[in-house]
């Protein structure tokens, strides 16, 4: 209170309880999209960890659902009348895996099949998978999504299916680092607590929606 009174300004607290799940997952992105940080000059985010460190590089996330629509039929009695959505999805899954050493070699793509049909004697007319597409930069992961859309188009032609790609949560950007702020915070934190903050960068493995904030507010 005394600091604010002497320097002026305002402290704003954004609460984000359970912000990682549900349709509004990575909810800080929603805050950014709604312009809640437009008049904020600087932001601090604290996250529990096993050590104290400066802001780290993080990966982007494109959280997408992939759906295939086909035509049901009896798998033994009249398989020729069906269009197997699961076959198309499995082919898509394997295609993504094959590209991990090629065009997607700099990306981290992982996912699960969430719906592959209900009974083995029925050709599934619907199949669904959920993926996280992670990259070093937002441009890189977004370009991967465009490539995946092209792959889906090709699979639809081959299997006579219809596919759909949708985002099931907010997308997550890469972190824009501000070394000057990290240095200032480290000096104040170490002087005040007597603890040491690690200054180096580690290989990015995770993601955070605080990165979305860093694109509009340091």
Map each language-model feature to its residues.
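Glycine-rich, small-residue loops and helix-cap segments
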Residues: 214
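Midchain, well-structured core segments that form catalytic/ion-binding scaffolds
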Residues: 38-183, 187-189, 202-211
């Amino acid at each position: 209170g005394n600091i604010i009174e002497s320097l002026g300004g305002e402290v704003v607290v954004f609460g984000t309880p359970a912000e990682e799940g549900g349709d509004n997952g990575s909810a800080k992105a929603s805050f950014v999209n709604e312009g809640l940080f437009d008049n904020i000059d600087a932001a601090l985010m604290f996250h529990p960890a096993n050590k104290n460190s400066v802001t780290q590089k993080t990966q982007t996330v494109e959280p997408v659902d992939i759906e295939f629509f086909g035509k049901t039929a009896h798998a033994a009695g009249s398989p020729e009348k069906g269009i197997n959505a699961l076959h198309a999805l499995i082919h898509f899954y394997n295609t993504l895996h094959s590209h991990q050493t090629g065009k997607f070699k700099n990306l981290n793509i992982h996912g699960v099949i969430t719906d592959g049909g209900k009974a083995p004697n029925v050709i599934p007319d619907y199949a669904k998978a959920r993926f996280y597409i992670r990259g070093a930069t937002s441009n890189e992961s977004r370009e991967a999504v465009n490539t995946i859309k092209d792959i889906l188009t090709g699979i639809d032609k081959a299997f006579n299916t219809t596919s759909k790609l949708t985002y099931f949560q907010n997308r997550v950007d890469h972190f824009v680092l501000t070394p000057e702020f990290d240095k200032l915070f480290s000096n104040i934190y170490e002087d005040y607590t007597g603890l040491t903050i690690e200054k180096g960068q580690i290989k990015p493995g995770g993601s955070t929606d605080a990165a979305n904030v860093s694109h509009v507010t340091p």
